[in-house]
């Protein structure tokens, strides 16, 4: 922490090489069971897990093309349960971007974007870009899931609500997806890579500008 008690800025991630294949580290966070692991598995392995098994910490690797650049994505899954609150920050070091996820059929997971995940990410990843993801959009049309939700006098989280949360946490983008039906899954990671690369370029320009001022 600095003298005022605010958390010190996170260490700057290592810059991706100037030519050839770029490499990015992306950490994904959100409540347990919100769809993080399914999203990562479908994108990186092409398989949707039929049974829920809580993750602790897992790493997935995938490639994406952004413009003419080949980008390697090192994707870090994290545990959303409170039991891992003290271990999870170990995943944040040298991160280029954080995906904050919630389940559109679970209002509590949506509320926790602002209550838990935004404060945690900004504390440990100060200055690192975020993208907000609404998961499990296919369940908005699932009659049984809707019945259960409405029995508790609740409604699915709408796209407009997701966009509002995105603005409140100052995330770079809000996207929705269904891992089960592979809807927008590739878009999530392609757009995340674009945001991370743009932030890297901006940081490099600022560093060069500071060097010029010193000279």
Swiss-Prot record:
Q: Which CDD domains match?
A: Rho4_like
Transmembrane segments in this chain: where? none
Question: What compartments host this protein?
Answer: Cell membrane; Cytoplasm, Cytoskeleton
Q: Which domain of life is it from?
A: Eukaryota
Residues recorded as bearing N-acetylmethionine in the entry: 1
Q: What is its main location?
A: membrane
- Propeptide stretches are 213-215
Per the record, its GO cellular-component terms are: cytoskeleton; cytosol; plasma membrane
What biological-process terms (Gene Ontology) are attached? Answer: actin filament organization; cell migration; regulation of actin cytoskeleton organization; signal transduction; small GTPase-mediated signal transduction
The record's GO molecular-function terms, alphabetically, read: GTP binding; GTPase activity; protein kinase binding
Give the record's membrane topology: Lipid-anchor
Which residue(s) hold a covalent lipid per the annotation (S-geranylgeranyl cysteine)?
A: 212
Asked if the record carries the keyword Transferase, the reply is no
A Pfam family = Ras
- Show where the record puts the motif Effector region: 52-60
UniProt binding sites for GTP = 30-37, 77-81, 135-138
* Residues where Cysteine methyl ester is found: 212
State the protein's purpose: Plasma membrane-associated small GTPase which cycles between an active GTP-bound and an inactive GDP-bound state. Causes the formation of thin, actin-rich surface projections called filopodia. Functions cooperatively with CDC42 and Rac to generate additional structures, increasing the diversity of actin-based morphology.
Protein name, as recorded: Rho-related GTP-binding protein RhoF
């Amino acid at each position: 922490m600095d003298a005022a008690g605010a958390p010190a800025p996170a260490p700057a991630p290592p810059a991706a090489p100037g030519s050839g294949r770029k490499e990015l580290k992306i950490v994904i966070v959100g409540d347990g069971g919100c769809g993080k692991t399914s999203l990562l598995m479908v994108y990186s392995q092409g398989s949707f897990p039929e049974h829920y098994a809580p993750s602790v910490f897992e790493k997935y690797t995938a490639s994406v093309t952004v413009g003419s650049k080949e980008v390697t994505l090192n994707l870090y899954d994290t545990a959303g349960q409170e039991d891992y609150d003290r271990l999870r920050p170990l995943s944040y070091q040298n991160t280029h971007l954080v995906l904050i996820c919630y389940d559109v059929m679970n209002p509590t997971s949506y509320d926790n974007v602002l209550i838990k995940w935004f404060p945690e990410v900004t504390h440990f990843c100060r200055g690192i870009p975020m993208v907000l993801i609404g998961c499990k959009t296919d369940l908005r049309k699932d009659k049984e899931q809707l019945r259960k939700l409405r029995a508790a006098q609740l409604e699915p989280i709408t796209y407009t609500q997701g966009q509002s949360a995105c603005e409140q946490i100052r995330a770079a983008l809000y996207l929705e997806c269904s891992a089960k039906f592979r809807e927008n899954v590739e878009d999530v990671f392609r757009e995340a890579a674009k945001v991370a690369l743009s932030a890297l370029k901006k940081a490099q320009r600022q560093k060069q500008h500071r060097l010029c001022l010193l000279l």
